[in-house]
C-alpha cells in the first residue's frame, strides 16, 4: 500500500472511531490488512498533523486537523520570503528576520521527494536537494510554491 492510501485510511479511522493512541490505531490498521511499523505511523502522524486531544472524561483521542487552506498558507509563507537563489549544490531562501524557521518547516511538510531537507537560521533557509541534478527543478518548484519570481 502506498503512503497516500495508507494516510487516507489513517484519517478515515481516526475520524470515524475514538482512537486513543498509536498502539490502538496499529491494531485497527492490522485488522484492515495494513501492516505498518510504529516508526512509519509516527512519520505519518507528523505529516498529517495528528494530535492527541483530551476528552471530557480525562482520556485522550487522536484527531486529524481539517485540511488547511493551502493557498492561504502558501500566500502567508510567500510574504515572508525575500529571495530564492541557488548554486551548483544548494538553494538559499532569504526571509524576513525571524521567519526562516517557519518557511523551512513549511517546505519540510511538503511531499516533494526532490527535497532532502532544510536547515533554517534566523533569516536564511538552506534547502538541500536529493541530488544536485535536481537543483533547477527544485528551485523552480520552490519559487512556484512561494510565488517568487
UniProtKB/Swiss-Prot annotation:
Its main location: cytoplasm. It is found in: Cytoplasm. Transmembrane segments: none annotated. GO terms for biological process: L-arginine biosynthetic process; protein complex oligomerization; regulation of arginine biosynthetic process. Pathway: Amino-acid biosynthesis; L-arginine biosynthesis [regulation]. One of its GO terms (cellular component) is cytoplasm. InterPro entries: Arg_repress (IPR001669), Arg_repress_C (IPR020899), Arg_repress_C_sf (IPR036251), Arg_repress_DNA-bd (IPR020900), WH-like_DNA-bd_sf (IPR036388), WH_DNA-bd_sf (IPR036390). Keywords: Amino-acid biosynthesis, Arginine biosynthesis, Cytoplasm, DNA-binding, Repressor, Transcription, Transcription regulation. One of its GO terms (molecular function) is DNA-binding transcription factor activity. Regulates arginine biosynthesis genes. Belongs to the ArgR family. This is Arginine repressor. The lineage of its organism: Bacteria, Pseudomonadati, Chlorobiota, Chlorobiia, Chlorobiales. The gene is argR.
Amino acid at each position: 500500500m502506498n503512503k497516500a492510501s495508507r494516510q487516507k485510511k489513517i484519517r478515515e479511522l481516526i475520524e470515524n472511531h475514538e482512537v486513543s493512541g498509536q498502539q490502538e490505531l496499529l491494531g485497527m490498521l492490522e485488522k484492515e490488512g495494513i501492516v505498518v511499523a510504529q516508526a512509519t505511523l509516527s512519520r505519518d502522524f507528523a505529516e498529517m498533523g495528528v494530535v492527541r486531544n483530551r476528552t471530557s472524561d480525562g482520556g485522550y483521542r487522536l484527531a486529524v486537523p481539517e485540511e488547511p487552506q493551502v493557498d492561504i498558507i502558501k500566500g502567508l509563507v510567500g510574504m515572508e520570503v525575500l529571495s530564492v537563489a541557488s548554486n551548483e549544490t544548494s538553494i538559499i531562501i532569504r526571509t524576513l528576520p525571524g521567519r526562516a524557521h517557519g518557511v523551512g518547516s513549511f517546505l519540510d511538510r511538503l511531499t516533494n521527494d526532490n527535497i532532502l531537507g532544510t536547515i533554517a537560521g534566523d533569516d536564511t533557509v538552506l534547502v538541500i536537494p536529493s541530488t544536485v541534478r535536481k537543483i533547477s527543478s527544485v528551485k523552480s518548484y520552490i519559487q512556484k510554491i512561494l510565488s517568487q519570481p
